[in-house]
Regions:
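Non-heme Fe(II) oxygenase catalytic core, chiefly the N-lobe of the double-stranded beta-helix
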Residues: 2-133
Length: 133
């Protein structure tokens, strides 16, 4: 497959890029390799305007390897076990500094977040590069 022309905008010196022009719902092996390369280069990669349902989200994750079931957080009722839903209206928040399952003997290479709605106040998500410290 010929990869689409994408736009990559670096967001800071230490980490982060925004990628446009790539549809994550139909990613083939070449696209997966491109995303992996972008992740290794930028450490955090944002893909705005993606609309992945739960099963599509899981299918995307599986293209990068075996998925982990989060050991401490519940999955949405009736949804895929690989997905954790943090919804403030249900009491779910992650409003303190944390890392995603790095305590595991074999921590996952990445986390895939699907940000659906941002509150008018708060709701900020920040990333930190441990390479840069």
């Amino acid at each position: 497959m010929t990869l689409p022309e994408i736009a990559v905008e670096r967001l800071s010196v230490a980490l982060g890029a925004e990628v446009r022009g790539l549809d994550l719902a139909v990613l083939d092996a070449d696209g997966v390799a491109m995303v992996r390369d972008l992740l290794l280069e930028h450490l955090v990669v944002f893909f705005p305007d993606q609309h992945l349902a739960g099963d599509d989200h899981v299918a995307l994750g599986r293209k990068f390897g075996e998925l982990e079931i989060h050991p401490n957080l519940p999955s949405p009722e009736g949804g895929p076990r690989e997905i954790v839903e943090l919804r403030a209206s249900f009491g779910g928040t992650a409003d303190e500094w944390h890392t995603d399952v790095t305590f595991s003997a074999r921590p996952p290479i990445m986390s895939i977040l699907n940000h659906v709605e941002t509150p008018e106040v708060g709701g900020d998500t920040m990333w930190s590069s441990q390479y840069a410290v």
